[in-house]
Amino acid sequence: MARAATTSDVFNAIAEPQRREILVLLRAGARPVTELAQELGMSQPGASKHLRVLREVGLVRDRKAGKQRLYGLDARGLRPVHEWTGGFERFWNESFDRLDEYVQDLKQARQED
């Protein structure tokens, strides 16, 4: 049951830290699974399983390049995450505005001393 949720939901897929690290590595460009596995300190089959999950939710694309398969980031798959976190933008903007006002008040108080 958990397997189905992981492969159909981008939030579940990126909940796994090693999958997020794979996405970070792929921001620099497409790479073969062996290179990703070595970078992450995991087995090639383990990296392949993570890549399969990421591919199934639309975060990774693969293409054949000679004898190897290259995996690349498809950031369009992060749209649901972006849209969901965007709902908190107002909260963060207001928080940063209050922090900025506080810092300005501190600066002004120091100048008056």
Go through the PLM ranges and name each one:
Residues M1-T6, L25-E39, Q44, E56-R61, ...:
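C-terminal regulatory/oligomerization modules of transcriptional regulators
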Residues D9:
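Interfacial catalytic loop of ABC nucleotide-binding domains
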Residues A13-Q18:
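Short helix-coil-helix linker/hinge
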Residues R20-I22:
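Pre-recognition alpha-helix immediately N-terminal to the DNA-recognition helix
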Residues L51-R52:
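Short, hydrophobic-biased segments on the C-terminal half of alpha helices
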Residues K64-L70:
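Short, Lys/Arg-rich nucleic-acid/phosphate-binding segment
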